[in-house]
Amino acid sequence: MERMLFLSPPSLAAHPEKLSTILSAHAQYSTELQMLDRLAAGLVSLPESTYDIVMFLIDADCLKTGSTPRMSRGVIESIVRALRPGGKLKSEHGLFASPDYPDRTELVLAGLVFDDNGDLVKPNFGAQDTVPLKLGKKKKATPAASSGDGAEANGVTVNMPIATDSKRNGQGAAVQGLGFVDFSDDLDLPPEDDDELIDEEALMDEEDMGRPIVQPPECRPKAGKRRRACKDCTCGLAERLHEEDTAKRANADAALETLKLGSNDLAEVDFTVQGKMGSCGNCALGDAFRCDGCPYIGLPPFKPGEEVRLLSNDVQL
C-alpha cells in the first residue's frame, strides 16, 4: 500500500471535521498527518524516502483572503528527502501549478520537476542507465557489388545517372538511384591509437634546451627577500636553500664557541710571565709599577713564578 503524508497549516487545526473528511477521502492510502508549523520549527522530522505522495493542504479561507501559505527552504528540503524516487508533491486546488505561486522557484531548485498534471515529481535517478560511448574501429573491407552503371571508389559504390535520349532531347533524365555513404566507415584509414604517448623531450632540440629561462618580472622576488621553495619542489631550489641555511648555521655556531686564550694573549692578565708587558709598555721596564690606576703601583717588578699578595692596610703611593 502506498504511503501518503498530509501537511496541514495551523489554520486547519481548528477544524477537525475538515481534516477527518480529507483523510476519509483517501482511505486507499496509508495516511499520516503532520502540522506544517511543527515541521518548520523542527519539532518533528520526516523519515527519508518513505512517502509516495505528499499532499499540501490549504484552508479555503486563506484562498478567499489571498493569503497563500508559504514554505521555508528547510521545509521544502525535508519534504524532498521524505519522498521516494518517483514520488509526487501535490497541493489542493492546483496551487503549485499556478505561475504566481511564490515558492515555485524554490521547489524547482530543490530538485522537483513538474509533470503533465501540474504535480511536482521527484526524479528517479537510479532508474537511469549508463550508456558507454565507444570509438569507431577499422572495419574490414568487403567487396561491394557494383552494377554496370556504377563507379566504385574506396569500397563505396555510387550509382551514376545514365544519359538517355530524353536528356539529349532536352528533357530531364530520371535519376536511376543514389548511393548512401556510411559515415561510420573509416574508408580504410589507418586506425588511431588512443594510447599513444608523446615524449616531451622529443618536442625540444638542443638549441631549445640551451636557452636561458626568462623569469617574468612579476615572478621575481622583491628586494631584500629571497624566493621561497614550493612544498613539492622539484627544481632543486629547496635543496639549495637548505645548503645555504646549513652553512650559515655552521658559521654562527663557530662564532659562538667558547673564547680560548693562548700564551700570547696573557699580557694583560698575568704579569708574572717573563718578557710580557702591559698595554702601556712600562711594566717591568723600571724598578717599580708606575701607571696610574694600576693595582700594583709602587711595587717592585715581579719575578717569574713569584706569589704576590696585596694587603688592605698597605698604603699605595
UniProtKB/Swiss-Prot annotation:
[2Fe-2S] cluster binds at C219, C230, C233, C235. It comes from Uncinocarpus reesii (strain UAMH 1704). InterPro entries: Anamorsin, CIAPIN1, Dre2_N. The C-terminal domain binds 2 Fe-S clusters but is otherwise mostly in an intrinsically disordered conformation. The N-terminal domain has structural similarity with S-adenosyl-L-methionine-dependent methyltransferases, but does not bind S-adenosyl-L-methionine. It is required for correct assembly of the 2 Fe-S clusters. A motif (Cx2C motif 1) lies at residues 280-283. This is Fe-S cluster assembly protein DRE2. [4Fe-4S] cluster binds at C280, C283, C291, C294. Component of the cytosolic iron-sulfur (Fe-S) protein assembly (CIA) machinery required for the maturation of extramitochondrial Fe-S proteins. Part of an electron transfer chain functioning in an early step of cytosolic Fe-S biogenesis, facilitating the de novo assembly of a [4Fe-4S] cluster on the scaffold complex CFD1-NBP35. Electrons are transferred to DRE2 from NADPH via the FAD- and FMN-containing protein TAH18. Pfam families: CIAPIN1 (PF05093), DRE2_N (PF16803). Residues 219-235 are annotated as: Fe-S binding site A. Monomer. Interacts with TAH18. Interacts with MIA40. The keyword Iron-sulfur applies. Residues 132-209 are annotated as: Linker. GO terms for biological process: iron-sulfur cluster assembly. Coiled coil: none annotated. Belongs to the anamorsin family. One of its GO terms (cellular component) is mitochondrial intermembrane space. The keyword 4Fe-4S applies. Residues 280-294 are annotated as: Fe-S binding site B. Its cofactor is [2Fe-2S] cluster; [4Fe-4S] cluster. Keywords: 2Fe-2S, 4Fe-4S, Cytoplasm, Iron, Iron-sulfur, Metal-binding, Mitochondrion. It is found in: Cytoplasm; Mitochondrion intermembrane space. The gene is DRE2. HAMAP family: Anamorsin. PANTHER family: ANAMORSIN. Its main location: cytoplasm.
